[in-house]
Design a protein with these regions (language model features):
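Active-site rim elements
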Residues: 32-38, 91-95, 165-176, 189-195, ...
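Beta-strand elements within well-structured catalytic alpha/beta cores of enzymes
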Residues: 60-65, 98, 105, 122-127, ...
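A long, amphipathic alpha-helix that forms part
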Residues: 45-53, 80-121
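Flexible glycine/proline-enriched surface loops and loop-helix/loop-strand junctions
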Residues: 28-33, 86-90, 125, 139-143, ...
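Loop/turn elements at helix/coil->beta-strand transitions in domains of secreted/extracellular proteins
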Residues: 56-62, 117-123, 155, 214-216, ...
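C-terminal cap/loop subdomain of S1 sulfatases and analogous C-terminal strand-loop tails that border
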Residues: 4-9, 131-151, 166-170, 174-250, ...
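Histidine-centered active-site microenvironments of extracellular/periplasmic hydrolases
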Residues: 72-77, 110-165, 177
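Formylglycine-dependent
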Residues: 1-59, 66-75, 84
Length: 282
């Protein structure tokens, strides 16, 4: 293990602050607090490369969770210089942070390629949520932001690479979830997904065309005072003290038209299913 236990932290090491009691923000290596030299995104990438080089002959699982572009908004002067044409300071810093992460990922993939394991390695890339407010990110044309259940808060980039099985550049537009990563990886490794009682779905039959339906007919979200449900292209959002809104994403991806009044029976049906799901989570 190399990293921190929660959230994010400064991207630069400051010895005057590393002895603060917030141990979950310290950088650890296999349980021991360690200093680091350089920009944290670069450090995470280098640690991943060293892991790959140490186990170059063995099957492996690598979970590389960059803190970028989460706040605090820190970037190196060199990377900021690359985006000096962006006049908005927050947007410029955000772009520099994304650039640094992209560079680090590229180096990790180059290392994987150098070891000759690219063809039979599954690589997943995704974000945990949409862009936050006040940090220079832009979710347009989607509505909303991190923390709420409009598409701008929950629809994220989701890429998979497995050259031995799938050609590059293919697009799959079925309803999928980050929960599907484990189920798909388990199946790819020869595990039994059927009896595993997983929330996620093995995507391989859908990606190969053996299954023609959608991996999920329904998906649910809930956090604090926001809840949401997808039923195919229908989406119901609940906000505490506001009520329900209904959207048809097939023709309103931007969620501009609340059509709950026009479809009361659908709203009632989805409300009931959402409440049943929420009761199972308690």
């Amino acid at each position: 293990f190399y990293g921190l236990r929660e959230g994010s932290r400064s991207y630069f090491f400051n010895p005057d602050r590393e002895d603060k009691p917030s141990s979950t923000k310290r950088i650890e290596k296999n349980g021991a607090t360690v200093p680091f030299d350089g920009y944290l995104t670069d450090v995470f990438g280098q640690q991943a490369i060293e892991f790959l080089e140490d186990d170059s002959e063995k099957p492996f699982f690598l979970y590389l969770s960059f803190t970028a572009p989460h706040g605090p908004m820190h970037a190196t002067e060199e990377d900021l210089e690359r985006f000096k044409n962006i006049t908005d300071k927050k947007r410029r810093t955000y772009a520099a942070m994304i650039w640094a992460m992209d560079r680090a990922i590229g180096k990790v993939l180059d290392s994987l390629d150098d070891s000759g394991r690219t063809e039979n390695t599954i690589v997943w890339f995704l974000s945990d949520n949409g862009g936050a407010t006040g940090n220079g990110s832009i979710n347009r044309p989607l509505a909303g932001h991190k923390g709420i259940k409009f598409e701008g808060g929950i629809r994220v980039p989701f890429l998979m690479s497995w050259p031995e099985r799938f050609p590059a550049g293919a697009i799959y537009d079925g309803l999928v979830s980050s929960m599907d990563i484990f189920a798909t990886s388990l199946a790819a490794a020869g595990g039994n997904v059927t009896d595993a009682h997983l929330d996620g779905v093995d995507l391989l039959p859908f990606l190969t065309g053996k299954e023609t339906g959608a991996p999920h007919q329904q998906l649910f979200w809930h956090k604090l005072w926001f809840s949401a449900m997808r039923d195919n292209n229908w989406k119901l959002i609940y906000v505490k003290d506001y009520g329900y809104a209904l959207y048809n994403l097939a023709n309103d991806r931007e969620e501009k038209q609340n059509i709950a009044v026009e479809h009361p029976r659908r709203v009632d049906s989805m409300k009931e299913q959402m409440n049943i799901w929420k009761s199972m989570m308690e």
